[in-house]
Structure formats: structure tokens, C-alpha cells
From Swiss-Prot:
Presence of the UniProt keyword Coiled coil in the record: yes
InterPro entries reported in the protein's UniProt record: FPP_plant
Record Pfam families: FPP
Compositional bias annotation for Polar residues: 471-482
Gene transcribed to yield this protein: FPP5
Lineage of the organism: Eukaryota, Viridiplantae, Streptophyta, Embryophyta, Tracheophyta
Protein name: Filament-like plant protein 5
Chain segments annotated as coiled-coil in the UniProt record: 59-94, 133-248, 280-301, 359-387, 601-622, 737-841, 876-906
Segments for region (Disordered): 1-20, 409-482, 496-534, 962-996
The organism of origin for this protein: Arabidopsis thaliana
Signal sequence bounds: none
Presence of keyword Coiled coil: yes
Positions of transmembrane segments: none
Subunit details: Interacts with WPP/MAF proteins.
């Protein structure tokens, strides 16, 4: 039993040695019995042998005999005791046999326990290896942790400083931005309220304008329908003109044939030259009259100043929208210190507001202009219509008067009447070739019967020319030759035939036809014999023409006096039937003209009153406008010490107040207004609110209105014409010859004026078309302005969306800052939690170290117990058995505990083996040179970390994860070999101690 160690402390290689002590234990009782028998035989041999001894020895022996006796007694006692001991030994041997069986069973159990202990030893070795590697790793990790904590502390201090600086800077910046944004938000809210009100007003105005545009479009559609009607009428008129041209061509051919037959080309050329000179004179007169009528029309229509002003306004509008940078630069230079503090959104909003205001002003001004132009057009159309109707009626009446006057004068002046009747017969005979024209259409597109007589001036001109020629022809001396008389008649025929060709315009030819139709209508309506008179007159004219032709053809050798007398006689024969009828028509026409003249005078008075009221209202509006626009300028002049503008304003207001009473005239008011405009233009500092783009237009418009009304009130051509007609009627009633001549002259003048008026009417129509085109351009401008309004509204909405985006971005920044604060708090909590976990892990490592030390102490105790048990012999066997059983139980408990610990440590070891990094392998390979004992001694010192540092410094979760993964990484093969060698040394030293 001496050489046997504890089975749980022995290696698998010591199994052979453990079997020998077991055999010794089984043979111990047999050896003890043989030893006792040998001792008894030796004592018997000693008693039989005798030896001679001395006295000393005998005495000594006697003494010894006593002692021997005593010893024999003792031996007997001992024998008895031996017998008792033998009996006891036998009983004990039986017990020993039983114990041997039990020991065999125990040995088998011990062997099983040995195998289990070997497995446990191996597991312990692996666990100790893992512990050693973990301790080495922990030491390295502690070093790394110290470095990391130091670096983290440094980084954290730097980051804390940076964070504090950044937080201070951001808080100050945030406060500034917040204050600025609050101010801007307030301003923008006010601007939005204003913009909302402006937008509401604009929407209302746009709705009104859209309604107005719808009305204008309806009117335009009506006008287009009227234009189509006019086109159809024009086509019909063109057809009539083509027919008339054909007739003219035929007539010209006939005239050429007659000229060739009579061989009078030289004389006709001279006469044509004379006519050309007269025509030049007439053209000069007509041009003068045209200039006069143009002046009158300029007074009625917008003048060239107003048209130029409108063109300038349109050009200024284009410049404003194409290049608004100048105004922006001026405003930026004026408000430089404010513009630096404003953001781009404010600039955009201000620009949008300015553009909106400007566009609204422009649209209002354009609407006012359009309304005024429409009013002017309607007024001019009405006036033209009235003048057309009146002129048509007067033309018809004058035509009838002319015919009656010719017939009336025939009785008194026979030769004159003969020649005049001849010319009229020729002209009327020529006129029958022309077909009647279609009724004309007025400017407004309405067909009227009265307007069909617009075309009268051409016929009046023809008759005037014929009459002049006839008068000239009749005034020649009777002593002229037959050739001169033929020249006169040829001249009459040329005038009758070539007048439409000389006019060279479709309007004059159609006018002649229309005037003839109007005269025929009025004469037919006024007379009781509608168609018979015209037929009889035509027959008489044809008969007269045939007789005159016969006279010229048959009487070639007769003198001129006889030819004239024959023609005169033939005319007098045919005259008697128509004198009575003409006189009746004359008195009817005079009554009608008087009534018409009275009506016209009443209407003129009413028009004058309305014009005077309009003038007073316009002057009052101008006065109010000038006062409102020159307040700031007067204040600035008062500050500068110059009060000229205030004085001129006072003079202007006094002249305006005196104007309704008649103390001051309209020219005085306009002079004062011009002075104010000059003073306003001299102000170069820009303080005057009469801005060029928004205020000049109404002033010029009002000035044009006032001047137009003033000129219209000063001139009235219709009144003059009707005064002339009144004078003519009075002269007709008197019945004097001189008055008749003057009346004829006046009638001729009226015809000329009427022709000029017709020309001016055509020009007015052209002007009307141009004004319509201008109105269309203005409508296009309004559409452009509306599109620009919509674009400005889009810009405003974009600016509002940008503002909303900015506010939302600031809100998101607030939320992001709050999230960052929450993240910082969560990171601090995580650092605290990681520190707590670190402390718990440290305590766990300390507990494992304490357990390892306890196991080492237990192993040492077991070794000492084995040494003690080997020194003792048989008496200590029972104690050894008892202690062995106790130790077995304790060993089983420890095995159970170790198995539990191994199960708890096994997943950690697997994780460590899996997640080992190559860097930590290299570090542990370097650290493998250190002994395990030193590592075990250093472990408690490694895990001591100052709590203040760990509390102060926050650990990044990524860093913590890296540290955790590095702490849990597995060891390499070299580390395993190193730790197996260390454990082999450790257990070999223990086995040596147990062998001792």
C-alpha cells in the first residue's frame, strides 16, 4: 500500500503499478501467521542449549530469570492474549476476507473512478489550458483595455471639448438663426396676409376682366359676322364696279371713235390741258379742305400726341419686362444695408409683389384706355351715322333743289337754260347705262336705307363740272365759229363720259350710282306719280338728244346763231310740261329742311350741355389726380425751401374752381397743368410720385380727353353746314336771282365739302380699322400681362414652398438635435451598463481564480494524505479505508461539480475557439514565454481597474464589441502545446510528491 497513490490522482500509465499493491493487500494476513510460528520455534531452540557463564552473568542471569519468569508470566499472558488475538484474528480474517471482497469491489469502483478521474483530469487539463489561455488573453486584453481606456479617455476628453465648443457655437448660432427666422416668419406672415388680400383683389379683378373679355369676344364675334356681311357687300360692289368699268370702257371707246371721226384731237388736247390745270387747282382746294377736315377729325379722335404716348407706353412696357435689372439695381443700391441681411426668399417675394402690383396697375390702365377708346368709337360711330343720315337727306333734297333751280332759271335765261338742259340731258342719258348699287353698310355693321345716299358727292361733282362747262360755254360770244361750238359740246360729252374714268376709284362711281338711287327714292316717295315721271323725263331727254344731234348733222352750212336758236327752241318746247311739278317739289323740300334744321339745333344744344358737363367732370378728376400725386413732391420742396410747386398747385386749384362759373377758360387750366408738369419733370431727386411707368399715362389721357372735348366744343362742322342750308332755304324763299346764284354757288361748295367729307369718311374708316388693330394688340398685351401675372403668382407660390421647406428643414434639424441628445444619453447608459458587465466579469474571473486555488489546495492535501497513509501500516488501514470512502464521496461530489462547471464553461470555450483573431494569436504567442504561475499571480492585478475612469469615459459600442470579440477569441495550436507542457510539469511534480 506504500507505493499506491490515490486513484483520482494517478495517470493512465500507473495502472500496472496500482495492481501490485492490491495483491500485497490480499496476502497480508498469511504473512503475519507464518512470522509468528517462526518466532516460537526460535524460542524453543534457545531453551535446549546450555552454556557456562560467570557469576556476574549468573547473577545477571538470575536476575534475568526473575525477569524471564516475569516474562514467561507475561508470555503466558501474551499467549492467552495471542489465542485471544488468534481468535480475534480469525474473526478479523473473515472480516478481512469480507473486506477484501469489499475492497475488490471498491477497487473495481476505484478503477472506474480512476477512468472517470482520468477523463476528468483530461477535461481539467483542457479546462486549465483554457483558463490559462483565457488568463493570458485576459492579461493581454487588460493591457489592451488599459490602452483602449486611455485612448478612449483622451478621445472622450477631446470629443467633450469639441462637443462643448460645437454646442456653444451651435447654440449661439441657433439662437441667432432662431431670432432671425422668427422675425422673418413674422414679416413673411404679414407679407402673406398682404399677398392673400392682394391675390383676392386680383382674383376679383381677373374675374371681372374675364367677364369683360367674354363680352368683348361676343362683340368681336358679332363684328366678325358684320365684317363677313360687309365682305359679301364688297364683293357685290366689286361686281357692280366691274360692270361699270366695262360700261366706262365702252363709253370711252365711243368717245375715241367720235374724236377720230371729227378730227379734233388738237383742240381736245388743249382743252384737256386746261382741264388739267383746273383739276390741279381743284385738287389744291380739295387738299386744303382735307387738311381742314383732318384737323376737325383730330379734334374728335385721339390726337397724334396721344397715339405717340400710347406707343411710348407700349415700348416702355416691353423694356420694363425685358430688362428689370435697372430698377432692381437702384432699389438694391438704395437699400444696401437692408439687402445684406435678407435671404434670397425675401428678394423673390419682394420682386413678385412688385411685379404683381405693377401688372395690376398696367391692367387697370389698359382697361381704362380700352373703355375710353370704346366710348370714343361708339360716340364717333353715332356721330358718323347721324351725319350720314343727315347728309343723305340733304343730298337728296339738294339734288331735287338743283333740278328745280335749273328748270326755274330756264324761264329767265333762255340761252343759259338751253345749254344747261343740254348738258343735263347728256349726263342723264349717260347715267342710264349704270345699274343701281347695293345699299351701303355703316361702320357698326347695320344696314340702313339712309346710308345708301352716301355716294352722292360723285354725281354732284359730275353735275357741277357739267354746269360749269355749260355756263362757260354759254358765256362765250355769239360771234365764235361753228368749230368752237362743237368744241363746247365735245367738252360736255367728254366730261360726262370721262368723269368716272378720271375719278379712278370704285367708291366715286358707286357713290354716283347710290346718290342717283337716293334721289330717285326720295323723289318717288314725295311725289304722287311714282314711275310715270321718270319714264316721261327719260323719253323727253332722249328726244332732246336726238333733235340736237340732227341739228348738228343736217345744218352744216348754217351759222352758229341759228343752231343755238334751234336747240333753244327744242328745249323750250319740252320744258313746259315739267315746270309745275318742279315748283311743287321745291316748297316741300324747303319745309322739311327748316324742320330738320330746328331739330339739329336742339340736338346741338343738348350735345353742348353734355360736353360741358363732361369737361367739368374731367377737369375735376384731373385736379383730384394732380393733388393726390404731388403731395410727396410738395413736402420735399417745402423741406428744401422751394415752394414753386405748391404755388402752381394753388393757382391750378383756383383756376379749376373758377372754370364752372366761366371766370377762367379751359386754356388757363391747361396752362397751369403744363406748369405743374414742367416743375415735376425738373425734380431730379426721384421724390415725386408721378412715376414714369404708372402715373404719366392717366395724366396724358386726361389731357387728351380735355383737349378733345375742348376742340369739339369749339368746332362743329355740321352746324355750319346746316346754317348754310338754312341760308339757302331763306334765299330760295325770297326768290331773287342774285340769291339763286349765290345759292347755286353754296350748293356747289356743299357738294365739294360733301365729297371731302366722303373722302374723310373713308379715311376715318381706315383709322377705325387701325384702331381696331391697335385694340387687338392691346388685348394681346393684356393676355401677356395676364400670363406674366400667372408666372408671378407661380413664383410667389414657389417662394412660399421654399419658405415652408426652410421651416420644415429647421424643424427636422430640431428633431435631429433631440435625437442626437437621446443617442448621447443612450450611449451613456450603455457605457454604464458595459461598466457593470465588466465589473461582473471581473468578479467572475476572481471567483474562478479562487476556485482554482481551492482545487490546488485540495490536491496538495490529497497528496499529503497519500504520503501519511503510505507511512502507516496495518493499523491505519481501517482509517485509510474510511478516509478513502469519504474521499471517494468527496471526489464524486467534486466530479459532479466539475462536470457542471465544464458544462457551463463548454459554450464559452467553443465561442473562444471560434472567434479568435490572428492578431490575438500573435500576441498570445509572444505572451506564451511567460510561465503559467506568473500569469496566475498577475491575474488579480490585471483585473484591478480604477472605477472612476471607467465611469467617466464612455465606450463606443463598436469598440466594446471589438474588445469583447478579441477577449473571446480562441488560442492557436502553439498555445495549446505550451499549456499542455505546463500542465504536464504541474501534474508530474504532484506525482513525484505522492511517490515520496
Amino acid at each position: 500500500m506504500e507505493g499506491r497513490g490515490w486513484p483520482w490522482k494517478r495517470k493512465s500509465s500507473d495502472k500496472a503499478t496500482t495492481e501490485k499493491p492490491v495483491v500485497g493487500i490480499e496476502s497480508t494476513p498469511v504473512c503475519s501467521l507464518s512470522y509468528l510460528a517462526s518466532l516460537e520455534n526460535q524460542e524453543k531452540c534457545k531453551n535446549t542449549n546450555y552454556v557456562q557463564i560467570t557469576m556476574d552473568s549468573y547473577t545477571h542471569m538470575s536476575r534475568m530469570e526473575d525477569q524471564v519468569k516475569l516474562f514467561e508470566v507475561q508470555v503466558k499472558d501474551l499467549k492467552e492474549k495471542l489465542t485471544l488475538a488468534h481468535s480475534e484474528i480469525n474473526t478479523k480474517e473473515s472480516l478481512i476476507l469480507q473486506h477484501a471482497k469489499v475492497a475488490e469491489e471498491a477497487v473495481s469502483g476505484w478503477e472506474k473512478a480512476d477512468a472517470e478521474t482520468l477523463a476528468l483530469k483530461r477535461q481539467l487539463e483542457s479546462v486549465t489550458l483554457l483558463k490559462l489561455t483565457a488568463e493570458d488573453r485576459a492579461s493581454h486584453l487588460d493591457d489592451a483595455l488599459k490602452e483602449c481606456t486611455r485612448q478612449i479617455r483622451i478621445v472622450k476628453e477631446e470629443s467633450d471639448k469639441k462637443l462643448q465648443d460645437v454646442i456653444l457655437a451651435k447654440t449661439s448660432q441657433w439662437d441667432k438663426i432662431k431670432a432671425e427666422l422668427e422675425g422673418k416668419i413674422d414679416e413673411l406672415s404679414e407679407g402673406l396676409h398682404r399677398a392673400a388680400s392682394d391675390n383676392a383683389a386680383l382674383t376679383r379683378s381677373l374675374q371681372e376682366r374675364s367677364e369683360m373679355i367674354v363680352r368683348i369676344s361676343e362683340e368681336r364675334s358679332k363684328a366678325e359676322a358684320d365684317v363677313e356681311k360687309l365682305k359679301t357687300n364688297l364683293q357685290l360692289a366689286e361686281k357692280e364696279i366691274s360692270y361699270l368699268k366695262y360700261d366706262l370702257h365702252v363709253a370711252s371707246k365711243e368717245v375715241e371713235i367720235r374724236n377720230e371721226e371729227k378730227n379734233m384731237s388738237l383742240k381736245s388736247a388743249d382743252i384737256a390741258n386746261k382741264q388739267h390745270l383746273e383739276g390741279v387747282k381743284k385738287i389744291a382746294k380739295l387738299e386744303a379742305e382735307c387738311h381742314r377736315l383732318r384737323g376737325l377729325l383730330r379734334k374728335k379722335l385721339p390726337g397724334p400726341a396721344a397715339m405717340a404716348q400710347m406707343k411710348l407706353e407700349v415700348e416702355g412696357l416691353g423694356h420694363e419686362f425685358t430688362d428689370p435689372r435697372a430698377q432692381r439695381n437702384m432699389s438694391q443700391n438704395h437699400n444696401a444695408h437692408i439687402a445684406k441681411a435678407e435671404i434670397s426668399t425675401d428678394h423673390k417675394l419682394e420682386e413678385c409683389k412688385r411685379e404683381n402690383v405693377y401688372l395690376t396697375r398696367r391692367t387697370l390702365e389698359m382697361e381704362e384706355e380700352i373703355q375710353t377708346l370704346k366710348e370714343h368709337l361708339s360716340a364717333r360711330n353715332n356721330e358718323l351715322q347721324v351725319s350720314r343720315n343727315v347728309c343723305a337727306k340733304t343730298l337728296g333734297k339738294l339734288k331735287i333743289l338743283e333740278g328745280q333751280m335749273h328748270m326755274f332759271n330756264n324761264d329767265k335765261n333762255a340761252p343759259k337754260s338751253n345749254s344747261r338742259n343740254l348738258s343735263e340731258s347728256l349726263s342723264s342719258g349717260h347715267d342710264h347705262h349704270y345699274p343701281p348699287s347695293v345699299t351701303s353698310v355703316s361702320e357698326d355693321g347695320f344696314d340702313e336705307e339712309g346710308s345708301s345716299s352716301e355716294c352722292g358727292p360723285a354725281t354732284s361733282l359730275d353735275s357741277h363740272k357739267v354746269r360749269k362747262v355749260s355756263v362757260n360755254g354759254s358765256s362765250k360770244p355769239r360771234s365764235s365759229s361753228r368749230l368752237e361750238l362743237m368744241d363746247d359740246f365735245l367738252e360736255i360729252e367728254k366730261l360726262v363720259g370721262s368723269d368716272p374714268d378720271g375719278a379712278n376709284s370704285a367708291s366715286k362711281s358707286s357713290n354716283s350710282v347710290c346718290s342717283r338711287r337716293s334721289v330717285e327714292k326720295q323723289s318717288s316717295s314725295k311725289s304722287s306719280e311714282p314711275d310715270e315721271d321718270t319714264t316721261t323725263l327719260d323719253q323727253l331727254l332722249m328726244v332732246l338728244r336726238s333733235r340736237i344731234n340732227r341739228i348738228f348733222e343736217s345744218q352744216e352750212g348754217i351759222s352758229i346763231d341759228k343752231i343755238v336758236e334751234a336747240a333753244r327752241f327744242s328745249i323750250q318746247e319740252m320744258q313746259g310740261s315739267s315746270t309745275k311739278r318742279m315748283s311743287s317739289h321745291l316748297f316741300e323740300v324747303t319745309d322739311e329742311t327748316l324742320e330738320k334744321h330746328v331739330d339739329i339745333q336742339n340736338s346741338e344744344k343738348e350735345q353742348k350741355n353734355t360736353k360741358q358737363q363732361d369737361l367739368e367732370a374731367a377737369v375735376a378728376n384731373i385736379h383730384h389726380f394732380i393733388k393726390s400725386t404731388t403731395k410727396e413732391a410738395t413736402q420735399l420742396q417745402d423741406m428744401n425751401g422751394n415752394g414753386q410747386l405748391r404755388e402752381s398747385l394753388e393757382d391750378f386749384s383756383s383756376s379749376v374752381s373758377k372754370y364752372p362759373t366761366g371766370e377762367s377758360s379751359l386754356s388757363d387750366v391747361m396752362l397751369e397743368l403744363s406748369r405743374i408738369s414742367v416743375l415735376a419733370s425738373n425734380l431730379n431727386n426721384g421724390a415725386l410720385t408721378l412715376k414714369p411707368h404708372s402715373k404719366e399715362i392717366p395724366v396724358t389721357e386726361s389731357n387728351d380727353k380735355v383737349t378733345l372735348l375742348f376742340e369739339e366744343s369749339d368746332s362743329n362742322p355740321l352746324g355750319d353746314t346746316f346754317a348754310k342750308t338754312d341760308h339757302c332755304v331763306d334765299n330760295l324763299i325770297n326768290g331773287d336771282d342774285s340769291s339763286c346764284k349765290s345759292l347755286l354757288k353754296e350748293v356747289e361748295q356743299l357738294k365739294l365739302e360733301k365729297e371731302n367729307i366722303a373722302v374723310e369718311l373713308s379715311r376715318c374708316l381706315q383709322n377705325l380699322e387701325s384702331t381696331k388693330a391697335w385694340l387687338e394688340e392691346k388685348e394681346q398685351l393684356i393676355s401677356k400681362l395676364k400670363s406674366q401675372l400667372t408666372s408671378s403668382e407661380d413664383l410667389q407660390s414657389l417662394a412660399e414652398t421654399q419658405l415652408k421647406c426652410v421651416t420644415e428643414s429647421y424643424k427636422s434639424l430640431d428633431l435631429h438635435a433631440k435625437e442626437l441628445e437621446a443617442k448621447v444619453k443612450s450611449l451613456e447608459e450603455e457605457t454604464k451598463r458595459l461598466e457593470m458587465a465588466f465589473t461582473t466579469e471581473k468578479h467572475g474571473h476572481e471567483e474562478t481564480l479562487a476556485k482554482c486555488r481551492d482545487l490546488q489546495e485540495k490536491m496538495q492535501r490529497n497528496e499529503t494524505c497519500e504520503n501519511c497513509s503510505s507511512s502507516k501500516l496495518q493499523p491505519n488501514q481501517e482509517k485509510d479505508i474510511v478516509s478513502a470512502t469519504e474521499k471517494l464521496a468527496a471526489c464524486q461530489e467534486t466530479i459532479h461539480l466539475l462536470s457542471q462547471q465544464l458544462q457551463s464553461l463548454q459554450p464559452q470555450s467553443n465561442h473562444i475557439l471560434k472567434s479568435r483573431s490572428p492578431e490575438k494569436k500573435f500576441q498570445q504567442h509572444k505572451a506564451s514565454e511567460v510561465t503559467p504561475n506568473s500569469a496566475l499571480d498577475d491575474l488579480p492585478h490585471v483585473h484591478i481597474i480604477q472605477p472612476s475612469r471607467s465611469v467617466k469615459h464612455t465606450v463606443n459600442p463598436t469598440v466594446h464589441a471589438i474588445m469583447k470579440s478579441s477577449s473571446v477569441s480562441s488560442s492557436s495550436k502553439e498555445d495549446n502545446e505550451k499549456h499542455t507542457r505546463g500542465l504536464g510539469r504541474f501534474f508530474s511534480s504532484k506525482s513525484k510528491n505522492s511517490a515520496r
